[in-house]
Amino acid sequence: MKTRFLNEMASLLVVLLLFSCTGKFEEYNTDSTGFTDEQKTYDYNTFGVWLKVVQMGIYFNYDWGNGKNWHFQTMQNLNADMFSGYMHDFKPFNAGLGNTVYNLQDGWNGTMWDNTYGYIMTEIKQTEDHSRDKYPAFYAIAKILKVEVMHRISDYYGPIVYTKFGESDAGVMPDSQKDAYYAFFRDLGEAIHLLSEYDGEETFSRFDMIMPENYRTFGEWMRFANSLRLRLAVRIAMADPDKARDEAHKSLTHPAGLLEEAYEVVAVSTAGTGYSNPLGEINKAWGEVFMNANMESILKGYKDPRLSCYFEPATGQGYSGEYRGIRQGTGFNHSRYSEHSRSTITQKTDAILMTPAEVWFLRAEAALRGWSGEDAGTCYEQGVRSSFNQWRVGEANTYLRSDLVAADFVDTFTPEYSAKALCLVSPAWDEEASRETKLEKIITQKWIACYPEGCEAWAEQRRTGYPRLFPVLVNKSNGKIDTRTMIRRLNFPVSI
C-alpha cells in the first residue's frame, strides 16, 4: 500500500508541477505586480517580481486571485500555531470537529502543500533557471529563500518534492526527509559561496522585503543563510548527529558570521511592500486568534514581561485585565471564551521568520552538545537578553536569576479543563543541572522567544518534547493520534 501511495502521489505531483510551471505563469508574474512585460525587460524587474512573490509566500499572504489571509489561516494558524501551544480559537469550525480535536481536515491540511507548490515554488524555479548564469547573486538568494520555504513544508509532512521539482519525468519521486535536508544544506552552502564574491548593498535591495531596513546587504543574507543552516543542523541533531555536527561547524566557523545583533531580525516587512500580516487580519478583523493555555501557564508563572507584548488582557466580566488562555480541545461552547486574551499582532506587524535570540539558543544547544567551544549558559543568557531587547521590555538580569516555574492552568468556566503545570524548569541557568534539564531550559526559552512563528515552535517541540505542553482535551482522531505523544505531522492532502 505504501509503494502504491508513493507512486500515485508522484504521478499526480508531476501533473500539478507541470501545470503550475506553465499554465498560470502570466497570472502569477503579471497580474499581482503591476509590471508590464515590457517593463520587466529592464533592470532587475523580472527577478524582483519573482523574488517578492516568494517572500510573500513564506509567511503566506500572496493573492493569486482568490483573496488573502484565509490561506494562512488553514496553512498555519489552525495547524502549527495551535499545535505549538501558542494560540487557539474559540470558534467551533466544522461543528467543533476540526484540527483542534485531532479530527484533521483534509481541506486545511492540504493548503500548505498546494499553495506552496502551486504558487511559490514555480517562482523559485523561474528565478533559478533564468539567473543561474547571468545573475549569480539573485540565484544565491533564490536558493536561500527556497530552503526557508521548503524546510517548513518538510517539517509539516516529511517527504517532499524538492531536488526534482518541475521535471517532466513521470517517474519523479519525492525526496525522503533525510535527502531533502541534505539538499537544503547543499543549497545553503552554494548560496553562501556565491554571495561571498559580493560586498556592500544588494543591487536589488528595493525588492528585498525580509532583511532589516538599512541593512539590506549581501553580508546580511550570508548571515541569514548561515543561521538557517545552524537551525537545520540542530533540527537533525538526534536523527543524524554526525551530519548535524558537521553542518553546525560550518555555520559556527564561517567568517560571515551569524545573526546576533539586536537589529538583525529577519521578517517580511509590511512597510510599503504590498504585504500585510495575515495573522493580524485573522486576529484583529476576524477576532479568531486567542492565547493558548500553555502560554498563559508558562508566561504568567515566570512573570515574563513579554506577556503583554504578545497578548492583550482579557475583557470578560469578573476577570477583565487578567491574561486568560484557552486549552486545545476545549468544549464547543466556545462563545464563552470570546473575551479571553487576544494576540497583539496587527496587519501592519512584520511577519517574523528568524531572530538573533533564536540563533543564540541554537548556539547554546550546539555548545551543550560539544559542537563548539562556546559556553552553553552564556549563549542561553544572551538569547534571553536578545529577546528582551527585541521586545523592549528592559533588562533581563532579574529574570535570569528567577527560580519561578510555570503556573497551574485554571479554566475560567469549566473546572475539569484545568491542569497542573507541566513545565517545571525556571529561567535561571543552573550549571550543576543535568544535560537534559539544561536542554529543556534552552528549548523552553527559545519557544518563548520564537513567538509568534508557530511553524518553528511546533517543529522544535516535536523534536525535543519541550516545552512540556498540556495534552489535547478531546481527541477525535479515532486512535490515529496518541493524546500524550500528540500530533507529529500533517497528513498529505488527498488531492495528491
Over which residues does each language-model region extend?
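Extracellular glycan-recognition regions
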Residues: 24-26, 110-112, 466-467
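Structured, solvent-exposed acidic/aromatic patches
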Residues: 41-45, 88-145, 149-396, 432-440, ...
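Beta-strand acidic-aromatic groove motif in beta-rich domains, primarily in extracellular
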Residues: 63-75, 159-160, 245, 454, ...
